[in-house]
Amino acid sequence: ITATTGMDALTHAVEAYIGNSTTPGTRKNALDAVKLIFENLDTAYTDGSNKEARRNMLRASYFAGCAFTKSYVGYVHAVAHSLGGQYNVPHGLANAVLLPYVLEAYGKTIHKKLAALAVAAGVADTETPVEEAAAGFIQAIKDMKARFGIGDFIPEIQEEDIPKLSHYADKEANPLYPVPVLMDAGELEKFYYMLMPAKENTVQ
């Protein structure tokens, strides 16, 4: 629970920051949240009795909440909500698994923003080339997932459900969420295929 709810807060902050409806205040909140999460989530996970780490994670969750309440979220949440509704997949777990896939799919459009998040997370500095910093931030998320034993797949997904699930995600996200790259229901299907275990993964 500590790991997945912590990564849920991270997803709130990241999606709020990379979207197209930010303000100076929401950007600051998101950066503060990312910094606190990268500084404290591992400790809170490995030492649940560490009150300082848990207190800082509460602050991070608050800052991330302030950010996305005004700036909204994106396709990570839209897809995750469909998985929760269909299969009862825990929301934080779905977000954690999805986040790197969606960030990579957005491509260069968000590299500059990911670079700023990488600096906040402590995985890059202001002198790091933008593309390198962006890739480093996504890798840091993958590494965090691995440390927490969070995998890359959602085994509950059934291929025959994918058109319906992508329709739900599309209706939630478009036009409500100010995503950096627009995708329709057909394009969103790829994320569900990516989340299927490798032996069943038939994405083309």
Explain the meaning of each model-derived region.
Residues 33, 60, 117-120, 168:
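Short acidic/histidine-centered micro-motifs embedded in hydrophobic/aromatic stretches
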Residues 37, 41, 64, 117, ...:
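Hydrophobic alpha-helical packing residues
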